[in-house]
Amino acid sequence: MKVTKAEIVISAVRPDQYPGGDLPEIALAGRSNVGKSSFINTILNRKKLVRISSKPGKTQTLNFFIINDMMHFVDVPGYGYAKVSKSERAAWGKMIETYFTTREQLDATVLVIDLRHPPTKDDVMMYDFLKHYEIPTIIIATKADKIPKGKWQKHLKVVKETLDVEAGDEVVLFSSETGLGKEEAWKAIHKFTKTKNA
């Protein structure tokens, strides 16, 4: 998809701050420092729309972006970062749960994981949480450029088995460095968004 407009609308922590309207919405989740910001910047053809932090756990708000005036992307704070306090973790959990369980505009979630390593316990918990609430999920297996091509399928198999991926949930090989999987990611997203303008 050609992205002509991508800008932040609001950083929210409560439902009354979420944007109104009925635009299709895609949430983007993943472990801290997994490459989620790079994924967003790559598929939106933007170098610095989402700041790539060297400090994990930096994003503590739900960041709503409007794309081509047709849909919202929602950058969800990264999970699994050990150095945040218990109270911060509890606040994060409440904010995330509220968003995922009450947001009617949400069409699907992109879950970004690192293809180089088996999914972590936190990745499994996040995927199980999304499945519990019957939220369609697209799994982006990023950093594929860091693995020899001949080993991609082996690593993908580990991802699918560890997460116990449900039928119908796509797993897309991706690299922010090479652009691999960019088109496939958009195709997967468009299956869930109600927009017909793509």
From Swiss-Prot:
SUPFAM superfamilies: P-loop containing nucleoside triphosphate hydrolases. Keywords: Cell cycle, Cell division, GTP-binding, Magnesium, Metal-binding, Nucleotide-binding, Septation. GTP binds at residues 30-37, 57-61, 75-78, 142-145, 174-176. Pfam families: MMR_HSR1. Its cofactor is Mg(2+). This is Probable GTP-binding protein EngB. InterPro entries: G_ENGB_dom, GTP-bd, GTP-bd_ribosome_bio_YsxC, P-loop_NTPase. Belongs to the TRAFAC class TrmE-Era-EngA-EngB-Septin-like GTPase superfamily. EngB GTPase family. PANTHER family: ENGB-TYPE G DOMAIN-CONTAINING PROTEIN (PTHR11649:SF13), MSS1/TRME-RELATED GTP-BINDING PROTEIN (PTHR11649). Residues 22-195 form the EngB-type G domain. One of its GO terms (cellular component) is cytosol. GO terms for biological process: division septum assembly.
